[in-house]
Amino acid sequence: MPPKKKVTGLIKLQIQAGQANPAPPVGPALGQHGVNIMEFCKAYNAATESQRGNVIPVEITVYEDRSFTFALKTPPAAKLLLKAAGVPKGSGEPHKTKVAKVTWDQVREIAETKKEDLNANDIDQAAKIIAGTARSMGITVE
């Protein structure tokens, strides 16, 4: 087994699927760690091509020889809720002004999508986490 490479950095970014390019925020974040920016952009775009239209968080691990690996996460719950509710953004005053409604079925569907990234034992707990996110955005769950 080859010796383990030493990790020099961990970068977390949220990028539109299939649309990574060297412009900010991607370029400067990767440039600081000496990563080949175009190589990452091509690999990320290829990996997320099927999910166009979503924001896909990515965790990039940079090694001392300037190589890197990356792990894709599920889209942020807030973005999935906005899409389900059909509104462009959440409420400025979530506890006073409600902007939309989503059903429990939609919340459960989002929880299914996000299950691997959530700290929940079962789908009901995951749905409660998503419902809490909805509440803090001014979206009513029925």
From Swiss-Prot:
**Ligase listed as a keyword:** no
| Subunit structure of this chain's protein | Part of the ribosomal stalk of the 50S ribosomal subunit. Interacts with L10 and the large rRNA to form the base of the stalk. L10 forms an elongated spine to which L12 dimers bind in a sequential fashion forming a multimeric L10(L12)X complex.
- State the family named in the UniProt similarity comment for this chain: Belongs to the universal ribosomal protein uL11 family.
Encoded by which gene?
A: rplK
| PTM field | One or more lysine residues are methylated.
Q: Which Pfam families match?
A: Ribosomal_L11, Ribosomal_L11_N
Q: Which HAMAP family match?
A: Ribosomal_uL11 (MF_00736)
Which NCBIfam families does the UniProt entry name for this protein? L11_bact
Keywords for the protein's UniProt record, in alphabetical order: Methylation, Ribonucleoprotein, Ribosomal protein, RNA-binding, rRNA-binding
**GO annotations of cellular component type:** cytosolic large ribosomal subunit
Q: What is this protein called?
A: Large ribosomal subunit protein uL11
GO terms (molecular function) for this protein are: large ribosomal subunit rRNA binding; structural constituent of ribosome
Which processes are annotated in GO (biological process)? translation
Tell me which PANTHER family the record gives.
60S RIBOSOMAL PROTEIN L12 (PTHR11661), LARGE RIBOSOMAL SUBUNIT PROTEIN UL11M (PTHR11661:SF1)
- Entry-linked CDD domains: Ribosomal_L11 (cd00349)
Functionally, this protein is described as follows: Forms part of the ribosomal stalk which helps the ribosome interact with GTP-bound translation factors.
Q: Which parts of the chain span the membrane according to its record?
A: none
